[in-house]
């Protein structure tokens, strides 16, 4: 566990199915359009997140983002803002898991996905 550090993992919901369907149907124009939207969205989300003091992008690409956040800088409403912006830019939803370790963040992301997506699940954040 990293004292004072939280991890936020975000992942677009059902993106793989959209890509698979486009490829299987031979609709490369749709896949290309989705890819461009995802690239733009992830660049935008990365900039939005990194503009917050204490927030650092660990990785961002495809429909995934990982953010290391100083505990005192964490704001749940900012995660919701990132989720809303992803939807505005792509038309799809995004789930997030936040945890006191990268493993916990990943588990919380998997929980959010298992519950249907478009959800933020967090560990209890220490005060």
Task: Place the predicted regions along the sequence by residue.
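Regulatory and interdomain segments flanking nucleotide-handling catalytic cores
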Residues: 1-127
């Amino acid at each position: 566990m990293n004292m004072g550090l939280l991890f936020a993992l975000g992942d677009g919901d059902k993106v793989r199915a959209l890509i698979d369907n486009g490829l299987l149907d031979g609709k490369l124009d749709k896949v290309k359009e989705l890819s461009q939207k995802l690239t733009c969205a992830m660049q935008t989300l990365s900039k939005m997140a990194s503009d917050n003091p204490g927030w650092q992008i660990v990785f961002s690409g495809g429909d995934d983002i990982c953010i290391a956040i100083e505990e005192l800088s964490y704001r749940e409403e900012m995660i919701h803002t990132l989720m809303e912006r992803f939807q505005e830019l792509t038309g799809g939803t995004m789930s997030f898991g936040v945890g006191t370790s990268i493993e916990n963040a990943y588990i919380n992301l998997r929980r959010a996905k298992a519950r249907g997506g478009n959800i933020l699940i967090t560990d209890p954040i220490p005060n």
